[in-house]
């Protein structure tokens, strides 16, 4: 179990089973664990005094041995249309991570970060510029959703795990977060309302498939051949495209779930007629959806987004050969909602 610098357990880093064992060791009755889980994960309390159906004695024990340490909102940015709010959360150790609230007609979606920084090195991503600092704990990921609900007063209905970090590089903590956010004692968000994005850690994709969670897996592809993907997405040097596609095929077979392939369009780099033909040939036999993404500009990078008319031609070709494809609706472009940008600007000023 995870402990902080004061050797206290952070209850939001535990799951129900671990809290049950902890409460049993305290000599308390089993139903107390269920009560505590609801306070911690559904109500999102920040103080043990708020757990009003627990005895004062038990609250005192919890205060002595555990913590409800939370990520706190440092700053936020609201898009001109008001449909996107970007939050910067401060962590207890002084680091910061970003989350984004996106308001859709079907509900509110929160994009969470899973690491401080990232070591994947994707060439057009701001999150990876200074490398990986550390993994987030399950509670630190969960706090992003709780904090946004608390700040806005609006229920979160969908989770997108595509903020800073590679989720499958923080596998166990992300799975525990998923368990808690989905649970009845938590926010009870359906697995089919959760999307997890990976740049292609093939062994972890295989492990995830065996869990048979009905989440949506999104694969950051961004290139249709190894030569180009080696440059844009360096993990491809370890797991080549044929290995990635095989892992995707196995994932579909085991889970029965359609995979989303993300393809960030970079002008003059991966958006030619030959690239779209290669992409179509690569994905034509898979149960999949292709999400074309006009890339967000990053100050330290020189990439330019593909012009709209070329994006449309790219989309039309894929559709013509029978593939399911959409162009991602742009939210929050005016507030630099691309991963990592708000954090880096904040840290440069502080």
Curated annotation (Swiss-Prot):
SMART domains xrefs: Elp3 (SM00729)
Keyword terms: 4Fe-4S, Cytoplasm, Disulfide bond, Iron, Iron-sulfur, Metal-binding, Methyltransferase, rRNA processing, S-adenosyl-L-methionine, Transferase, tRNA processing
Enzyme Commission number(s) from the entry: 2.1.1.192
InterPro entries: Aldolase_TIM, Elp3/MiaA/NifB-like_rSAM, Methyltransferase_A, RlmN_N, RNA_MTrfase_RlmN, rRNA_lsu_MTrfase_RlmN/Cfr, rSAM
Binding site for [4Fe-4S] cluster: 118, 122, 125
GO molecular function: 4 iron, 4 sulfur cluster binding; metal ion binding; rRNA (adenine(2503)-C2-)-methyltransferase activity; rRNA binding; tRNA (adenine(37)-C2)-methyltransferase activity; tRNA binding
Cell compartments where the protein resides: Cytoplasm
Disulphide-bridged cysteine pairs: 111-339
Any GO CC annotation of this UniProt entry: cytoplasm
List of catalytic residues: 98, 339
GO biological process, one term: rRNA base methylation
Function: Specifically methylates position 2 of adenine 2503 in 23S rRNA and position 2 of adenine 37 in tRNAs.
PANTHER family: 23S RRNA METHYLTRANSFERASE, RADICAL SAM CORE DOMAIN-CONTAINING PROTEIN
Entry's family note: Belongs to the radical SAM superfamily. RlmN family.
The name this protein goes by in its record: Probable dual-specificity RNA methyltransferase RlmN
Organism: Desulforamulus reducens (strain ATCC BAA-1160 / DSM 100696 / MI-1) (Desulfotomaculum reducens)
Encoding gene per record: rlmN
